[in-house]
Amino acid sequence: MSQSISAQSGYTLPVFACASAIAAVETLLTSNCPDSVTLELLEPARTAEIAIEQGALLGHHRALAITRSEPGNNLDLTRHTPVWAEVEFTPGEGKLIIQGGEGIGKQLDREGQAAIYSYAQRLLRHHLQPYISGDQTLMVSLILPLGRTLATRTSNAAFGVVEGLSLLGTSGIAQPLSAPEQLAEFQQHLTSAAQQHQCLVFCLGENGLDLARQWGVPLDQMVKTANWLGSLFVAAAAVGVQEILLLGYHGKLIKLAGGIFHTHHHLADGRLEILTAQAVQAGLPYPLVQELGQAPTTEAGLKLLRHWQTEQNCPWVSKIYQAMADTVDRRSEEYVYKVSQHQLKVGSLLFDGDRQPVAISTQGQAMADKLGMTIPET
């Protein structure tokens, strides 16, 4: 059976992983692999029918099923990649154990724990727990045979995920992050959120959304922005938003400190140049500034600053990144006023590749307090 996917969007990897797992369990219980499975996405509250490519028994207590990722009309490197789930029932106490197999990334900051994040975990538990009786344990191993290869074409390593892809996302619907035709959809979401709140949180990508939720931002105050920060700043001011808290990866938000308001690297970069300029202003010794400028990435530059901070007992990270966060605020407010003559207060919260906060601006802290956020110490 075909999958019910709109012309504009498909489904995220967690949906296909869950569908494979459901099909594998059904194969194990009935000795027949279904042609498709229908599952609840939870986010949003709708169902999806996912085609099952194949499935097979691997013994009396084990089975395997396979789907293929279909992200819709997105420029997504996971298109058509196989998603396997192997399941096994063992004696137990009604538990569900979810494991990452080959091609599922490992989180360096969590001792190699599989990069299967909260939405994927929730989706799997919602659909698989009903199959488990009180004297059983269900073991589910998720496998992306091409995951290790595909991961070399992503920025996963910058976020501390190695050897494969993440099952990341806050929704079952896959939306392109950088396709221009999606800007109108983001603006529509922004307009809807602005009708309820004068303070919103702009979240860059899925990591920003996931952390916003973890740190206590109400769902109806989150707006996903992708790379169109400039356009969405102006749109927010035009519909009456008073305050925006930016929540994003430092390697993206650093561009705003340099006056770059479309953050896709194909259009503009300059990240290391901006970082070194901030370092000079903070008083970093010139030989270290030169070394910083040779870092391959901003994440590597941040690690150098942390090393020198420990070595010299000087708070280089907070000095440089606090000033940078405040500069992001100022340049953003100036941009909005220059383009639209509207006043908009901006705060910023930058996180690193380990998804930990690096710096929060003065205005950002005030907004976070107002929102009731609980943020780990920087």
From Swiss-Prot:
It catalyses: Co-precorrin-5B + S-adenosyl-L-methionine = Co-precorrin-6A + S-adenosyl-L-homocysteine. SUPFAM superfamilies: CbiD-like. GO terms for molecular function: cobalt-precorrin-5B C1-methyltransferase activity. One of its GO terms (biological process) is methylation. Keywords: Cobalamin biosynthesis, Methyltransferase, S-adenosyl-L-methionine, Transferase. Its EC number is 2.1.1.195. Pathway: Cofactor biosynthesis; adenosylcobalamin biosynthesis; cob(II)yrinate a,c-diamide from sirohydrochlorin (anaerobic route): step 6/10. Belongs to the CbiD family. This is Cobalt-precorrin-5B C(1)-methyltransferase.
